[in-house]
Every structure is written in C-alpha cells, then in structure tokens.
Amino acid sequence: MSSVVVVGTQWGDEGKGKITDFLSENAEAIARYQGGNNAGHTIKFDGVTYKLHLIPSGIFYKEKISVIGNGMVVDPKALVEELKYLHDKGVDTSNLRISNRAHIILPYHIRIDEADEERKGANKIGTTKKGIGPAYMDKAARVGIRIIDLLDKETFKEKLEHNLGEKNRLLERFYELEGFKLEDILEEYYDYGQQFKEYVCDTSVVLNDALDDGKRVLFEGAQGVMLDIDQGTYPFVTSSNPIAGGVTIGSGVGPSKINHVVGVAKAYTTRVGDGPFPTELFDTIGDTIREVGHEYGTTTGRPRRVGWFDSVVVRHARRVSGLTDLSLTLLDVLTGIETLKICVAYKLDGKTITEFPASLKDLARCEPVYEELPGWTEDITGVTSLDDLPVNCRHYMERIAQLTGVQVSMFSVGPDRAQTHVIKSVWRLA
C-alpha cells in the first residue's frame, strides 16, 4: 500500500494539476477530496492542453480509477458540461467514480453567492461566484442535497421544495432578487443526474479497497493551504479544507493510510482575489513574472497578484499539513532576474516573527524580511536533472529547502510533462 497527498502550499495555482498528472503515471487511483469547480487545473496530455475544474487529473489514464470524493461540492450542470468537453476531445471517462455522498450546487447557491459578494462591496472576499460557499453552508446546516438524493426524483423534489421556500425568501426579501420556481430546477437537474448516474457509487469503499489491495492511490487537493477555512487567511479563504487533513474527511480514507504529503510551491508566490499578501510586488519585476508565468486565473481569467517566495507561508503549510516533500514549480519563470529575494521572516512592530500570524490586522502591519540571492541567466527549460541546473538555481532551491524545513523532491522548469524532474521518489514506502 502506498498513498500520496498533493497539496498547494500557497494560495492555490501552484501547479498541482501538473504535478498530480505527472504522479498519476505511477498511481492506480486518483481522487479529489474537497472544493468544486472553483478550482482550475491545466494539464497537457499527449500534446493537447486540457482545462479541468471538477474531474480529477487522472481521467486521462483509462486504466486508473478517477474519483470525485464525498468532500467535494458538485455542480451537476458543470459536471455534465465537463464530461461533454472531454468526450468531444475523444477522452474515455468510463474510469470516473463519483461519491454518492458528495453535495450538489444548485442555481440558488450561485445566485446567492453572486448577490452576497456584490453586497459586501469593499469588503468582498474575492469568491469565484460558483456557489461553493453557499453549498457548503447548506451542508453544515444539514439542509444540503447530495448526489444520492439527486438520483431519486421523489427525494430530490421533496428536499428541493423545502429549500426553495427558504432560499426564495432570502433572495426576494434580503437581496431583492427574483427567486426560483420548482419547475425551473427539478427536471433540468434531475436529468443532469441521470446523465452521470453510471459513475455514482460509494467511493470510500473504492479507495479503501484499492489501498487494501496494495495499490497506489493519489489524492489531489484543490486551492492551497493559505485558502484553508481553518488554517488560511480567514475570511479570505475557501469554504473547505485543502490541507492534508481534509483527505480523511473528504475521501473516507483513514489517516493511518496516508504515507506521504507533497507540498507544491511556485518558485515565487501568487494570489487571486482579495486578502493579505506580505511579499506582493507592485513593480516591473512583478509585471515580468506575471507575463512570463502567464499568471491569469484558470477559472476566472483574473490577473494573479505576484510576489517573492515566502518561506513563512510554506513553513506554515509544512506544519499544518505535515509535508514530507516539496515540489518546486515554475523555476524557469525566474530566469533572467538578476537578484532574487526570499522572505525569511516578518517584522511586526519592530519585532521579528517567523510564524504566520492569525490576525489580519497584524498581517497588514507585517513587513517581509528578505534574503537576497543571485539569479541565473541560463535557459533551464531543457535540463534533464538537478545537476544540469545552473549553480545559482541549485543554491536557490537548497535555500528554500533549508528555510522551509522540507526536502525538495521534485522540480519543474516548464509546462510539459518532460519538464518535471524527480530528485527523490514520493512513492517510496518510507
């Protein structure tokens, strides 16, 4: 038995999809455990670029099981559209398994999400407006509708009718928006469920059986540790737990069955949406990194905020997710920058702190303490091993490992699979 969790160590968009796709080659089952279609994964497979939001990266390997876990919130319409997108490109999806316990996103979740973000004005969180938060709210309030409910028309109608009474009052009286009629949703969404019911099962059984049979299972996180609802920059976070601990809740696999946790980190830092970002750059270097790194959101298309690598953030990720390995991505983007900076600590009211603070007021007053390292000018996109990297690039990676306390086991120097390189296998048994 061998299992690996892939988590983002920053604010998402670290290249998890690419690393998951790379590691999928040696996995026999790949599972997502939280989030929904608010997360975007860009994957290159056989020379074709795919953009996925719900379906795990492992879908391209038809001999491997690809799982949408119970911790996810699934927009049935978006799922049907994504399946069609893959089918139109000739991708076989018969290896997909969808948890019957996953909750669904309905049109009223999306409308409430949009209205609430608009209402907050300057205090907006930066949600993708996909209905994720309201769906998780219903789940916590025990009024959510699960996929197993969607497949039974009588149950779906009963639960939907009950929820619409409350949601319409909220939309009409508080947000002053039009509500929904039962018939607006019932037939359309029941039909969506019928289109993917062949994939629906108890995915906890599927995953545990695979592990008990000695198979390799890969768990694919969405977003990143700093967007975790408990450990991130609350309230500028997502509504679920992207940290490694979310795997056990969101997949139905116990913690004793997790072997390694791979933290994916960009060689710099980015963030989409509002919220604190201590190392953010507002100069030409930031603009250069954004353009060279194509730093625009997969889901929203919004320009990402860009900053220097922050070891305080990744140390926090190491601690709360129990990172065993680090995968450093987009090293090639930094080529040509004369002097690189790594944030080693923060200054808060004249005092040096080395751990990420919980208070947003404290964060707003934090000034990054930088260590400067010489950059490199050599093209590294064609290297095939660690030894091929320029000495300054290797020193940069070594310093990141020292400052974060996590070994760099993989690094990436471009978007293609062949540009991801292994220093130490994360599939090791010890």
UniProtKB/Swiss-Prot annotation:
The active site is at D13 (proton acceptor), H41 (proton donor). Substrate binds at T298, T299, T300, G301, R302, P303, R304. Pathway: Purine metabolism; AMP biosynthesis via de novo pathway; AMP from IMP: step 1/2. One of its GO terms (molecular function) is GTP binding. Keywords: Cytoplasm, GTP-binding, Ligase, Magnesium, Metal-binding, Nucleotide-binding, Purine biosynthesis. Signal peptide: none annotated. It holds the Pfam family Adenylsucc_synt. Its EC number is 6.3.4.4. It catalyses: IMP + L-aspartate + GTP = N(6)-(1,2-dicarboxyethyl)-AMP + GDP + phosphate + 2 H(+). It is found in: Cytoplasm. GTP binds at residues 12-18, 40-42, 304, 330-332, 412-414. It comes from the Bacteria. Coiled coil: none annotated. IMP binds at D13, E14, G15, K16, N38, A39, G40, H41, T128, R142, Q223, T238, R302. One of its GO terms (biological process) is 'de novo' AMP biosynthetic process. Homodimer. PANTHER family: ADENYLOSUCCINATE SYNTHETASE. Plays an important role in the de novo pathway of purine nucleotide biosynthesis. Catalyzes the first committed step in the biosynthesis of AMP from IMP. Belongs to the adenylosuccinate synthetase family. This is Adenylosuccinate synthetase. It comes from Listeria monocytogenes serotype 4b (strain CLIP80459).
